[in-house]
Amino acid sequence: MVITRDFFLFLSKSGFLNKMARNWGSRIAAGKIIGGNDFNSSIPTIRQLNSQGLSVTVDHLGEFVNSAEVARERTEECIQTIATIADQELNSHVSLKMTSLGLDIDMDLVYENMTKILQTAEKHKIMVTIDMEDEVRCQKTLDIFKDFRKKYEHVSTVLQAYLYRTEKDIDDLDSLNPFLRLVKGAYKESEKVAFPEKSDVDENYKKIIRKQLLNGHYTAIATHDDKMIDFTKQLAKEHGIANDKFEFQMLYGMRSQTQLSLVKEGYNMRVFLPYGEDWYGYFMRRLAERPSNIAFAFKGMTKK
């Protein structure tokens, strides 16, 4: 039986399985696919990765906040995380979704919360990446990024190759000298807004990698796909793009040896390290993004 992307996306939305994962799954996931239940418990993992030459970006799992109070709590938690990264001298960025700061509640609330976060990030020179979510929230997310990029240096965002609009988005952002993380995309979207065929997504991914790098902007190529890694290496070689102009990003717990090999080859390699109790939906979406990762994922989860 071929395990498909839609299968994992279906599982990611299961309330029952999510509840089960919260109740007992964190013991399995912690240290295998997530750093821990909170940021402080993830610090030893960050230190270990840093000692191997790997940079990190941390992400507190859990989005779609529907309370202003919870959104402000998430904001304060993020501010404390940034301060701790600086105090502990960890080589780490911070990633966060705008829905966790109140995107679905009130835009003024999001701007209030992001202003506080980025003021702290600028003070400590810690990069904050605004994660991209589903297509219906894409424009609002990009508008937020554009507004803050005009005022702050330490802010980046994410673009998804499976959306038709992404090449134009890169053109629209060009004047801001943006640091972009480029991904294929993991949400289930209509054929009206996204490429339905993997081959088309792959070709568009190459196209946006090429455009962003040749535009001269720092780029994070977030992929486990060897073909995309090799494409990026060859592109950089052909156009004389220095290794300090881009980085590769991979998920914690997947393809660890490949990550270390890239470091040995002289490439920047950053590990996406999530933490928190809401790990199940994240895990299923990552498998949906590339079902072949299932072997790497479960090997990592069962390794002692």
UniProtKB/Swiss-Prot annotation:
Catalytic activity: L-proline + a quinone = (S)-1-pyrroline-5-carboxylate + a quinol + H(+)
Required co-factors: FAD
Record InterPro entries: FAD-linked_oxidoreductase-like (IPR029041), PRODH_bac_arc (IPR008219), Proline_DH_dom (IPR002872), Proline_oxidase (IPR015659)
EC number: 1.5.5.2
Active site (catalytic residues): D131, R181
Keyword entries, A-Z: FAD, Flavoprotein, Nucleotide-binding, Oxidoreductase, Proline metabolism
Pathway(s) annotated for this protein in UniProt: Amino-acid degradation; L-proline degradation into L-glutamate; L-glutamate from L-proline: step 1/2
Annotated positions binding FAD: M132, Q160, K184, G185, A186, T223, H224
First and last residue of the signal peptide: none
Record site: Critical for catalytic activity: F272
Family under the similarity heading: Belongs to the proline dehydrogenase family.
Stated role: Converts proline to delta-1-pyrroline-5-carboxylate.
Name of protein: Proline dehydrogenase 2
Organism from which the protein derives: Bacillus subtilis subsp. natto
